[in-house]
């Protein structure tokens, strides 16, 4: 009988398609369909920052975040001081205007929140959390993940990056309705310079703040432009090898856009291992031209690049070919 090999041949295109779709999903990160880069506190365009999400409590926006996988959002730990009732939280994806989310937007309930256990309070290290959604979202032109960097990616001082959010435009004002997503280009500031800035003009009732090793500064010494209240947990992204990679998570600052007080972010690369422990299937963006590897739980080396799904499909094809030879 030759019928088994016919069934196997019918499975072949399905296996090839599965591998191709996996590779396409991985390539989706950091590649929005819309490009329009203007410097300085401007309205974003629809689909321009498709990983930006609004984290809401009882239907009200209180923090930003970034989609990093179909069921996971990266944000700040200080956004979740109390998670005893997880049912009050939801995530809004694919929206440009908070008050008028539009047809491309999607509300998804929160399943659980995992804060970094090393986090000890405002302005401390490890101010990162992972929000798991109730179910996976389908990637569209308006809902796409941002790439996360592995430790090989260095964000140099002076590098121009972007911060986005629905936070207040200043310490006194609230973003006017319909609350359009804002974008701002900010340069990276090296840690020694940032510490010097935060040591200037220190008021007597303020505790001196230190930029820790897992923190990253971005902004302007003269102030005037910065993230503000309501932006917390949102992404600081930089263009690396033609992909948008998240360098930091909005964490803290003194006021908003004050002189000598640039924004402080948590370095994503500093918490690469913790993120990978919770989401082992998540792949990280390495430097161009390098083949990044990670060890699985058994200590075996495995590829961490976009070729993995293709290699898996290739292996299945070889196995299927061997099966056909045995059958015929």
Curated annotation (Swiss-Prot):
Query: Keyword Aminoacyl-tRNA synthetase on this protein?
Result: no
Question: Which top class of enzyme applies to this chain?
Answer: hydrolase
The UniProt record lists the EC number as: 3.4.21.-
Q: Which SMART domains match?
A: Tryp_SPc
Q: Which GO terms describe its molecular function?
A: serine-type endopeptidase activity
GO biological process terms, semicolon-separated: proteolysis
Domain Peptidase S1 as annotated: residue spans: 38-280
- Name the PROSITE patterns for this protein: TRYPSIN_DOM, TRYPSIN_HIS, TRYPSIN_SER
Q: Which residues form the propeptide?
A: 23-37
- Disulfide linkages recorded for this protein, renumbered to the chain, are 63-79, 161-238, 194-217, 228-256
The glycosylation sites annotated in the UniProt record are 82
Among Pfam families, the record links this protein to: Trypsin
* Protein name, entry field: Serine protease 27
Q: Which organism is it from?
A: Mus musculus (Mouse)
């Amino acid at each position: 009988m030759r019928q088994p090999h016919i069934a196997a041949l019918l499975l072949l295109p399905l296996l090839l398609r599965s591998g191709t779709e996996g590779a396409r999903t991985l390539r989706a990160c950091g590649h929005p369909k819309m490009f329009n880069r203007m410097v300085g506190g401007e309205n974003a365009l629809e689909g321009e920052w498709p990983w930006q999400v609004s984290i809401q409590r009882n239907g009200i926006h209180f923090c930003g975040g970034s989609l990093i996988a179909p069921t996971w959002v990266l944000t700040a730990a200080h956004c979740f001081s109390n998670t005893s009732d997880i049912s009050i939280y939801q995530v809004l994806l694919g929206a440009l205007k908070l008050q008028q989310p539009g047809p491309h937007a999607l509300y998804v309930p929160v399943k659980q929140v995992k804060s970094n256990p090393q986090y000890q309070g405002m302005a401390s290290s490890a101010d990162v959390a992972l929000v798991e959604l109730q179910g996976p979202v389908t990637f569209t032109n308006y809902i796409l993940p941002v790439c996360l960097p592995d430790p090989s990616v260095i964000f140099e001082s002076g590098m121009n990056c972007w911060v986005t959010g629905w936070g207040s435009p200043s310490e006194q004002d609230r973003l006017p309705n319909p609350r359009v997503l804002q974008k701002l280009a900010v340069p990276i500031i090296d840690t020694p310079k940032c510490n010097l800035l935060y040591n200037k003009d220190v008021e007597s009732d303020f505790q001196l703040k230190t930029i820790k090793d897992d923190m990253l500064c971005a902004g302007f010494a003269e102030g005037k432009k910065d993230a503000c209240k309501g932006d917390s947990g949102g992404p600081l992204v930089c263009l690396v090898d033609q992909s948008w990679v998240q360098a930091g998570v909005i964490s803290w600052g003194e006021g908003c856009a004050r002189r000598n007080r640039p924004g402080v972010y948590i370095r994503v690369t500093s918490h690469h291992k913790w993120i990978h422990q919770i989401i082992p299937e998540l792949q990280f963006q390495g430097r161009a031209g390098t083949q990044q590897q990670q060890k699985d739980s058994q200590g075996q080396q495995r590829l961490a690049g976009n070729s993995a799904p293709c290699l898996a499909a290739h292996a299945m094809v070889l196995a299927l070919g061997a099966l056909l030879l045995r059958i015929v």
